[in-house]
Amino acid sequence: MKTLYSLRRFYHVETLFNGTLALAGRDQETTGFAWWAGNARLINLSGKLLGAHVAHAGLIVFWAGAMNLFEVAHFVPEKPMYEQGLILLPHLATLGWGVGPGGEVIDTFPYFVSGVLHLISSAVLGFGGIYHALLGPETLEESFPFFGYVWKDRNKMTTILGIHLILLGIGAFLLVLKALYFGGVYDTWAPGGGDVRKITNLTLSPSVIFGYSLKSPFGGEGWIVSVDDLEDIIGGHVWLGSICILGGIWHILTKPFAWARRAFVWSGEAYLSYSLGALSVFGFIACCFVWFNNTAYPSEFYGPTGPEASQAQAFTFLVRDQRLGANVGSAQGPTGLGKYLMRSPTGEVIFGGETMRFWDLRAPWLEPLRGPNGLDLSRLKKDIQPWQERRSAEYMTHAPLGSLNSVGGVATEINAVNYVSPRSWLATSHFVLGFFLFVGHLWHAGRARAAAAGFEKGIDRDFEPVLSMTPLN
């Protein structure tokens, strides 16, 4: 075997393949990893690993900018965003850019600016990635000790953790600043059907903010996904940003306690597994958030939630039949329950029919018709506004159901449109990615624990067919 780069930092895992097909310092013999193991070859080359990460960030930001401009180029202002397969413009609109009352897009220029800024940023990151991958120092420890590290240096690792937490905290505060001072954000609950507004009266009460995390995840409780006013969302970001920044300072200033040193595995692969586990949890939470929450993800941009489309259908036919003379308060359905209205298990008046299972739904077009005991019969008879009828008819025909061939909406709904809701795309993609990340977490956690215990030597490759084959070059 050739001289190892550094015995002290050699990762003892054998993955033989074809040692001839690699660059010096990044080949199988010096790193213990073959070419197909990707960045595992760079575990102990901090400079090259930096290049890989910066280049990866460049690819991510390039996608964001290019996809952003693609969506702007294809955008039709006359159609709702959710009918156009957009997944980036709804996020920009939710932040209050380019939209007015009712979520109507009045200016697409901010979206264009966002795309261009991301493209320019990606060029800078791409250059930095190529520089550090090809030209920069292989390791940072000698020339730039502040940026250098040894994976098992616990103090340095928690310092890096602290820096990352501070950056996340600053990110949370950027949303707070946008909502408070820089034009506000889109509030789907604004009177008359949603508008952009500045958030003035933040919720900072810890009992309210942390009350969400103590709620049950089931039914009408809905854990943090049940948040339904912007004051709570922005106030939550103040708390979260503060906790991240204070926690970051704490981790920079302190060394890990003895119990933490014993509890964790301190290696690069262990940190990878922790990160994948955290991202997996984020993916599953994001899946539930975008599927059920119509405040952080306004229905004007993302389309209605499943329960919302269902309740909208019940409301639309209640309106129609009431105009045709039906007494919606007492009409009986085929099961003997109320055809249009019935009572929930706890006594509230709710919509009847199959949509009874979604009786928890809260939506801006429906809440004005509720009284202290659920839906108010007198309001349903006298107070329904045209915008509520229009919006519910629109949502009824745009349920977030759909197949890959884009035959969207409820299969039995004759007025449904060919489309797949962005809610479907975002929820399913985040669920699948969350699952893959969880599998990756288990895989790398198992390898890291085995390596720490000293019995990870990879697969026995003495009889691997590839060893008897001619080298590729």
Swiss-Prot record:
It is found in: Plastid, Chloroplast thylakoid membrane. Binds multiple chlorophylls and provides some of the ligands for the Ca-4Mn-5O cluster of the oxygen-evolving complex. It may also provide a ligand for a Cl- that is required for oxygen evolution. PSII binds additional chlorophylls, carotenoids and specific lipids. Gene3D superfamilies: photosystem ii from thermosynechococcus elongatus. One of its GO terms (cellular component) is photosystem II. Residues 1-14 form a propeptide. Coiled coil: none annotated. Keywords: Acetylation, Chlorophyll, Chloroplast, Chromophore, Manganese, Membrane, Metal-binding, Phosphoprotein, Photosynthesis, Photosystem II, Plastid, Thylakoid, Transmembrane, Transmembrane helix. The modification Phosphothreonine is found at T15. [CaMn4O5] cluster binds at E367. It is a multi-pass membrane protein. The chain crosses the membrane at residues 69-93, 134-155, 178-200, 255-275, 291-312, 447-471. InterPro entries: PS_antenna-like (IPR000932), PS_II_antenna-like_sf (IPR036001), PSII_PsbC (IPR005869), PSII_PsbC_sf (IPR044900). The modification N-acetylthreonine is found at T15. It comes from the Eukaryota. One of its GO terms (biological process) is photosynthetic electron transport in photosystem II. It holds the Pfam family PSII. PSII is composed of 1 copy each of membrane proteins PsbA, PsbB, PsbC, PsbD, PsbE, PsbF, PsbH, PsbI, PsbJ, PsbK, PsbL, PsbM, PsbT, PsbX, PsbY, PsbZ, Psb30/Ycf12, at least 3 peripheral proteins of the oxygen-evolving complex and a large number of cofactors. It forms dimeric complexes. One of the components of the core complex of photosystem II (PSII). It binds chlorophyll and helps catalyze the primary light-induced photochemical processes of PSII. PSII is a light-driven water:plastoquinone oxidoreductase, using light energy to abstract electrons from H(2)O, generating O(2) and a proton gradient subsequently used for ATP formation. Belongs to the PsbB/PsbC family. PsbC subfamily. HAMAP family: PSII_PsbC_CP43. This is Photosystem II CP43 reaction center protein. The gene is psbC.
